[in-house]
C-alpha cells in the first residue's frame, strides 16, 4: 500500500494499538493516516512549525504525539484531533534530529550538535543534559531491562546512559568506530545491539562484554544503512515463526531497498519494500486493530480520550469491500512495515504476508560473496547538490520561511549513495572482526 504525503518524510510512528500512522514532513507538517488491509484515509494534518519536522515519538497509551525538528521546539499533539496541546519553545540550541519515548515519565531528544536531553512530560524544562557527543544524534535505542538509553552519533561512537543516574557522564561509550553510526536495534532477545553504518556494515555489540568495541561486523549492504528495526515480540508470538526469526532485523538502505536480514548466522531473507533509487530514511512496524480510525471531521463531537479506531470509524470500516472485511476478520495485514524516504510516499507492507512468501529481490545491485565494497567512489552525490535540492523542495511550499529549508540537516550528510546499482568499485580485505557470509549474501539485490 502506498500513501502519498506530498513532501519528504523524515520520521514515522505507528499508534500502539490502532491502525493509525503519523509522519513528520519536510514542510513542517505532521500528517496522520488511518488504514486497513485495503485502503487508507487522512486523519489530520497539523503544522506546528514552518520549519521541517524531523522527529516523532508517541507515548505508551497512544494519547500524545511528540514532534520536533529544525525549529528547535518540542510540540505535544493530541493523536485523535491533531490539536497542539503544549509547546516547549527553544528546547535545544540546535535543530532536534531525534525523539524517543522511554517511560510514562520520561522521553529523550537529541540535536545536531550531539546534545541529548531527558524530559519529564509533566515539566517544561529538561531534567538532565548529556554532552558526550560532538556530532548529530542519529538514533536512540531504549533498553528497558537496565533502564539504559543508547544513542548513536555521526561522530562515530555510541553511548549508553542510565536514566536513573543523576550524573551527566554516560554509563558507557564506545571507541571511535571510524564510521558514522546511523541506526540501532537489538537481537538475541536484547542481548546484542546491531548498529547500521555509513559504509553499509552491520556492527554487532555484545551488551554483556561492554560497549567499547563491536564484536562482529557483517558486510553486505551496497550502501549506507540509514534505518534499522527489529521484529516486535508481539509479532513473533502471533505468527508462525521460523528458526532465527528472533534474530531478524529490517534494514533501510540508501539504495532504496528495505531488507529482512537474519543476523548470526547471517542470511538475506528477502526484500520487503523497494523505494527505487531514493534512500530509505526510516522504518517502523505497527500492529493496529485492523479497522479505520475516525477522522477529525467524523469524530469531532466524540470524547477526546486519546484512543483511535472507535466510534464512527467502525461504521465506515463496515462499509469497506468484502476483501478488507475478510482480512480484518482473519487478522491478515494486522502487522505492517512502514518505510519512508525521499520519494514523498509512505509505503505500508504486510509483514505477515512477506514472511509467508519472502521475496528474493529483482537482481538489483549484486554484491560479491563477501558482500564488501568501497563506498567512497566518485559516484557519491555531492552534498551541495543535495542541499540545493532541499532548497528547491522547500521553495515549492507556499508558507515556508526563507530559511526554512533543511539543507543543513544531518540527513544531507547521510545521502551518500551511488547512482549505479553496482557497488563493486574496490574489493577490500576482510577485517579481523568481520563475519564470513556463506555464499552470495546479497546475491541478486
Question: Which functions belong to the PLM regions below?
Answer:
Residues 8, 17, 52, 61, ...:
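WD40/WD-repeat beta-propeller blade-loop signature
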Residues 2-9, 46-54, 89-96, 131-137, ...:
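WD40/WD-repeat beta-propeller blade N-cap
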Residues 1-3, 39-46, 83-89, 125-130, ...:
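A short beta-strand motif characteristic of beta-propeller blades
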Residues 19, 27-31, 51, 63, ...:
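Short coil/turn segments within WD40 beta-propeller repeats
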Residues 2-28:
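Beta-strand-rich domains and repeat architectures in extracellular enzymes and scaffolds
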Residues 35-38, 79-82, 121-124, 163-166, ...:
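Short loop/turn segments that connect beta-strands within beta-propeller blades
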